[in-house]
Regions:
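Core segments of cupin and vicinal oxygen chelate
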Residues: 15-63
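Short C-terminal domain-edge/linker segments immediately following a structured domain
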Residues: 43-48, 86-87, 95-100, 112-116
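Vicinal oxygen chelate
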Residues: 1-23, 73-153
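A short, hydrophobic/aromatic-rich structural module that often spans a beta strand
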Residues: 43, 47-91
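Short, well-ordered turn and helix-capping elements at secondary-structure junctions
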Residues: 17-19, 67-70, 114-117
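Residues that cap or initiate secondary-structure elements
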Residues: 19-23, 61, 89, 138, ...
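Intrinsically disordered, low-complexity segments enriched in polar/charged residues with Gly/Pro
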Residues: 39-43, 70, 116-120
Length: 153
């Protein structure tokens, strides 16, 4: 039997946060950083319980949902969620903006850009990525993925 159902798409990440991090100043800091670096904006939380901060990514139905909670989520330093960019220049521009922000706010964490190539039977794949963190318990991995026919880089 052939399955013609399209696979479901990931549409959001929900993270519980220390309520003190999501006070008025904390929300302003989160909105400023993620707005400046990633272009994310505050979404409408009307009707939501617990006064979450919703960061919309600009793509329809995709968002990061930050909910004040006690206890908040804790995670090891490399736990993350990922976003995919279409152009390598976009990835480098995001890193440049994050480094600019880091120059005046030491809460910004950046793991520098790294590329690796995986060899497949018919194609090779080059994954370029970086990790960026700011006050959330999870970092954001920014990825750019290119598929190459064998012998064509």
């Amino acid at each position: 039997m052939t399955n013609t159902t399209k696979p479901a798409k990931l549409n959001h990440v929900a993270i519980t946060m220390d309520p003190r991090v999501l006070d008025d100043q904390g929300r302003a800091d989160v909105l400023d950083f993620y707005g400046e670096v990633f272009g994310w904006r505050e979404g409408d939380n009307t009707g939501e319980t617990g006064n979450p901060l919703i960061l919309t990514t600009g793509a329809f139905g995709q968002f990061v949902y930050l909910l004040p909670a006690d206890p908040p989520m804790t995670a090891p330093p490399l736990d993350h969620f990922g976003i995919l960019v279409d152009e390598l220049d976009e990835l480098h521009a995001i890193v440049t903006r994050a480094k600019g922000y880091q120059a005046h706010d030491d809460r910004v964490k950046i793991i520098d850009v790294h590329a690796r190539t995986t060899h497949g039977p018919t194609h090779d794949y080059t994954l370029t990525s970086t990790y960026i963190g700011f006050v959330l318990p999870l970092m954001v991995e920014v990825q750019h993925l290119v598929r190459h026919e064998h012998g064509r880089f």
